Amino acid sequence: MKYKSLRGMNDLVGDQAKKYSLVESKIISLVNSYGFDEVRTPLAEVTELFERSIGSSTDIVNKELYSFEDRNNKSISIRPEGTAGVVRALIENDLDRHGIDVWYLGPMYRYERPQKGRLRQFQQFGVESLIDQEKSSQEELIRMELKVIGCLLDIVEVLNIKDFKLEINNICLLYTSD
């Protein structure tokens, strides 16, 4: 029997691996120069995290998650995106209320029909800037937003990307401590 990589999940070898490494090193150098800290999260999280953050009625949660039950009958999912795990890590490590700028880079997984430009395993880079909006001035919030935008535009320039769409989301998290 001959083994192959799973459908929609490709190996990176040779020149392709070198190209990915070059792009990643340029991105990492830039985000570090802006003062962002790296966050590495597990590939798997409890499914409830994605249901709550992405939405339990979304296609990502209902159709595209790679999920399984562990030996304790807990539903576990392989990450389909990075934000949920990063925010969970910052909250769990008590870094969410201090104002922090972080970046992440890594493989994400979605069970969808592979097609041009869309695979089941893909690399995602993201920056997250957490700040206490109640304790921060409007000026601080604008400065934080401009820092994120400036960093992302510099990445686009360094990578010589001509045709791009920049999407920015502002999520206000409300929660109480136990």
Predicted features along the sequence, with ranges:
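TRNA-recognition modules of translation machinery and tRNA-sensing kinases, especially anticodon-binding
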Residues: 1-177
